[in-house]
Design a protein with these regions (language model features):
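Conserved acidic catalytic loop of the alpha/beta-hydrolase fold
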Residues: 72-89
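Flexible "cap/lid" loop of the alpha/beta hydrolase fold
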Residues: 102-150
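Conserved alpha/beta-hydrolase catalytic His-Asp/Glu region
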Residues: 124-136, 146-210
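Short beta-strand/loop motif that positions the catalytic acidic residue
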Residues: 212, 218-220, 224
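Catalytic active-site module of serine/aspartate enzymes centered on a nucleophile-bearing elbow/loop
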Residues: 242-273
């Protein structure tokens, strides 16, 4: 079942590994489901069914002109859950994917979900506003948009250095990892890339947090420059009743690569509870 069809006839690429309780993995911007491969293999080996799909506009999925708002993206997730028969599923959302988890929990009342995990997630609200003073200033997102429109490949070359915490003194990932990430990001359509950036930058998920009525794990790096921890992971932990927050001291955004062994272990522990 490599492709499913969404409610608006968008084809979504889906891969399923293993058999057992379903774990649906939602990737971050601007990557694809392949970014979850290390964790998906371990999850499948541990006796679970790992389900990962490419968000519309990214990877091998269709690149429609519209549908990059979080309501539509949550509806896409609902189609994946329904058409794969993922009953009693755990949802794991990385970065932008955490927003889909949050909106699904409210918009679809958490149907078929028994656990949720938010990894380096944009939830609850990224944008700096009078009532969200620790958010990111709108000018930062405006600069991102301008950079992508001018030279997307060059923009991503710089973007992924912060994403993976690469600097003159720190090299938590290889040069090849950076090149891979940029190549995957360039597979996405420009329209979807820009529209999704606007969606994760401006969507307020604070009202969605009350819908998390299942055990919820939150993992975030304290040195995440892409999605800073204070208005994201720490704020989400305060807003989701009974959630568990694990902070990775000094860690950047791209934990699936920079801290893949620890992240995999923490996810498997959470799944086994």
């Amino acid at each position: 079942m490599p492709y499913l069809t969404s409610a608006d006839n968008t084809k979504l690429y889906v891969k399923e590994w293993g058999a057992g309780p379903p774990v649906v993995l939602l990737h971050g911007w601007p990557l694809s489901s392949d970014s979850w491969d290390d964790q998906a293999m371990a999850i499948a080996d541990a006796g679970y069914r790992a389900i990962a799909y490419d968000r519309r506009g990214f990877g091998r999925s269709d690149q429609p002109w519209s549908g990059y708002d979080y309501n539509t993206l949550a509806d896409d997730l609902a189609c994946v859950i329904e058409q794969t028969g993922a009953k009693d599923a755990t949802l794991v959302g990385f970065s932008m994917g955490g927003g889909e988890v949050a909106r699904y929990m409210s918009r679809h009342a958490g149907k078929s979900v028994v656990k949720a995990a938010l990894i380096s997630s944009v939830v609850p609200f990224m944008l700096k506003t009078p009532d969200n003073p620790e958010g990111t200033d709108a000018s930062v997102f405006d600069e991102m948009t301008a950079g992508m429109k001018e030279d997307r490949a060059k923009f991503f070359a710089g973007f992924f250095k912060d994403f993976f915490g690469v600097s003159l003194l720190a090299h938590p990932t290889s040069v090849e990892q950076l090149e891979w990430a940029r190549s995957v990001s360039m597979q996405a359509g420009l329209k979807g890339t820009l529209a999704c950036a606007k969606s994760f930058a401006t969507t307020d998920f604070r009202a969605d947090l009350a819908a998390f009525n299942v055990p919820t794990l939150i993992i975030h790096g304290t040195d995440d420059k892409t999605v800073p921890i204070n208005p994201a992971g720490r704020a989400a932990a305060k807003g989701i009743a009974g959630s568990t927050l694990i902070e990775y001291d000094g860690a950047p955004h791209g934990l699936f690569a920079t801290h893949k062994a620890r992240l995999t272990s923490d996810l498997l522990t959470f799944l086994g509870r």
